[in-house]
Structure formats: C-alpha cells, structure tokens
Curated annotation (Swiss-Prot):
Signal peptide: none annotated. Transmembrane segments: none annotated. Keywords: Antibiotic, Antimicrobial, Bacteriocin. This is Bacteriocin serracin-P 23 kDa subunit. GO terms for biological process: defense response to bacterium; killing of cells of another organism. Major component of a prophage tail tube. Antibacterial activity against Gram-negative bacterium E.amylovora. The lineage of its organism: Bacteria, Pseudomonadati, Pseudomonadota, Gammaproteobacteria, Enterobacterales.
C-alpha cells in the first residue's frame, strides 16, 4: 500500500488528468 501522502498526490494527479480530458 502507498503512504497516505502519495495516495493523495496520486488522486490530485488523476484530477488533473480528468480535467485535461474534459
């Protein structure tokens, strides 16, 4: 499992990827 900090960074990155798609 990833540390919490990395998990949130990954969610943040996914959010940017989603915005780039939309």
């Amino acid at each position: 499992a990833l540390p919490k900090k990395l998990k949130y960074l990954n969610l943040f990155n996914d959010g940017f990827n989603y915005m780039g798609v939309v």
